[in-house]
Structure formats: structure tokens, C-alpha cells
Amino acid sequence: MSLSASLTLTRARTIGAVDPRLYGSFIEHLGRAVYGGIYEPGHPSADAYGFRQDVLNLIRELNVSMVRYPGGNFVSGYTWEDGIGPLEKRPRRLELAWKSVEPNLFGTDEFMHWCKLAGLAPMMAVNLGTRGIEAAGALVEYCNHPSGTAWSDLRIANGSKDPHNVKVWCLGNEMDGPWQIGHKTAEEYGRLACETAKVMKWTDPSIELVACGSSGRGMATFPAWESTVLEHTYEHVEYISLHTYYGNRTGDTPTFLARSLDMDRFIETVAATCDHVQAHKRSKKRLYLSFDEWNVWYHSNTADKAMEPWQVAPPLLEDVYNFEDALVVGCMLISLLKHADRVKMACLAQLVNVIAPIMTDNNGPAWCQTIYYPFQQAACFGPVSYTHLTLPTKRIV
């Protein structure tokens, strides 16, 4: 039986302009993302700051617009003050999220300087797991206030005369997940996020904030979590986050290649929930979505379970990607583009070594994985057009 179909493409009907921040990525203090990834003093390509130039060149060629930092699960136990000031005075800490040791040789100021060299914008997350309002407000002051206060003057003393001017901030990470340090109910998180958002915006009214949405569409609390959180935070945030990862553990290629359809439904459900809360609050404000963790992730699961704990920068989540994975990443990018009217920011998680498009060897070369290339090509796109596909209605048995 032969079937016919027609595809109509028109530039007159656009979904919307693609925000450049749709092509963001993510660096977490996890595995070799930082140490041995973007930062490796003593490497043949490292500059005076310890930043690997071979990695920086690949990142520039990838067209990444923004990078989320420092986590991720890591941020829910992070004391940001540990990562500023003289290196020799920074403490080594047990890092509970990934059972590693954090030397704190790379912190806020190093990240900001690295972002400038890479030509991208920072997206900072604050700790709402073990910390809260005061620490978040202090970090905004440290990063963004010009001078004349304790925190801004400390930034200057640490070598950054000009403010870092971080414009996008995440209010914690995956607080709905039982694995999260300081896990909270939607009610608990919503109240804390609301009050933290107020203090952060009083410190710098120009910033934009991202509330924690569900850590996956399969969570039992989805989408009630979004509804409850937004009832508390709607007027104080600009975005709510979405996270998803897909894998092919059973070798079911057709289902794996279709997983972006699940991503479509995830986006549409969260957007509908946002609109419901907007209507309920009779608000004139429209909320947008930040898909700030997405990727293929499954290859490294077995090896990660066998990893010895309490190492500095152990090789965790080092998936080796194939062509099938690149196809799925390409389909996921199409899902983001199809919803460019609501999804304004997104972060491929992660950027280097950890489920990443770029891999390195310690004291060795850097190279690109298969998923590097669909992202690189998509980052060149502009406005998105509707496509209309007409199929015959006859049922096929």
C-alpha cells in the first residue's frame, strides 16, 4: 500500500524569535566538568588562570550562549564563600551530592572570568537546600553591586573591580527530588523561593529569576508541584525550570528516537499550568520556561555505581555517545525550537566530560562527541516557522 503526504512550509507563520539563550549549557562541580575539564593548571594549553584553551576553542565553536553554574545537585550543599579569595585559604570539603571531595580551587570569580573568555553569559544558581535568603542575597550583592558594601568591596579586594552583572539566577535545583540535599515539599519550597526572590530583587531589581519546576515529567508530584510553587512565586519570577534526560537501556531504538514527543508534552503541560496560575491570580504577566537540564544520559550508569567515593574530580557520568544519541539530541533541539514562544532558555547538560559534547584527557587532548554537531548546527538558526504535514486518514492494519 502506498501513502502520500504533503509538507507545507511558510515563513509567514512563525512561532516566534528564538532567544539566543536557548543554546545554553551547564557546568557543575561534578566529576571532571571543572577540574580536568575547563580548568587544569599545568595542562599544555592552559593559560595563566589554569583555563584549558583547547576546551575554550571548542566551546566557542559550539556557539554556546550561556552557562548555568555551579549546579545541579551540587549547589544544594554549596557554601559559595568557600570558593572566593586566596586559593591557599580555601577549604577542602566533602561534597555529599556526588560523594566527592571539593577543593574549591575554582569558584565564582574564576567562573565569571572564564565566561568572559568564552564569550558567554553566566546563569547562577543559589543554594536553597542547606541555605536560603541571606546567603542568596549576599551572593547577588557580591556579584552585582558596584561598591561601597562589605560584599561588593570583598569582590573588589578579590580582584574583580567591576560588577559581574549576572542577570539570570536559579532559585535552587530540583527541590522536588528526594535525592536533593534539603529536599522540600512544594509548599515549603514555594514559600522559601518567594521570600528569597524578594530579597534578591531588592538587592538588584534588574535580575531575572527561575523557580524550580519538576525534575522530570515522571515525578509523582508533577504537575501539582508547578501549580503550588507558582501560587507562591508567580509575581516574583520570570521563568520556571524543566529537566529531562532520555536513554535506551533496553535497545528499543524506535521508542528512543521518538522520546522528543515526551519532551513536547512536558513543555505543553508546564506551559498550561503556568497559564492556569496566571488566570487564577488574574495576572497580566506571562511566565516563560527555562529548560535548563536536558540531554541523553544512560551509558555511564553502571560504571558510576562502582566508583570509589571521596575523590577529587572522579570520572563520573562520562557517557560515550553514538549516532543514535546524536539523532535524539537533534530531535530534542527541534522540540525546543517548536516551543520557542514559551521556552526562552535551555541548557544542554552538561558541557565538558560529564554527559557532554566535549571530552578531555587529563594532560591530554580534547575532542568532540557526536552530540556536539546537532547542537552546533541548531545554534545558527533564527526565527522558527510552522510546518504543516497532511497525512491520509485511512487506518493501516
Kindly give the residue locations of the regions a language model identified.
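Active-site-adjacent substrate/metal-binding segments within catalytic domains
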Residues: P20-V126
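Conserved, mostly hydrophobic/aromatic
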Residues: S25, N63, C115, L139, ...
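Aromatic/acidic polysaccharide-binding cleft in carbohydrate-active enzymes
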Residues: L30, S290-G382
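Aromatic- and acidic-residue-enriched carbohydrate-binding clefts of CAZyme catalytic domains
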Residues: Y35, E40, V75-T108, T149-W179, ...
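The substrate-binding groove and active-site-proximal loops of carbohydrate-active enzymes
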Residues: G37-A48, R90-N104, M124-T130, G172-G190, ...
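An active-site-proximal structural segment forming one wall of the substrate-binding cleft
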Residues: V55-V64, F111, G132-V168, A193-T203, ...
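Noncatalytic carbohydrate-binding groove/subsite architecture in carbohydrate-active enzymes
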Residues: A186-M332
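Conserved small/polar residues in nucleotide/adenosyl-binding loops
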Residues: T387-T393
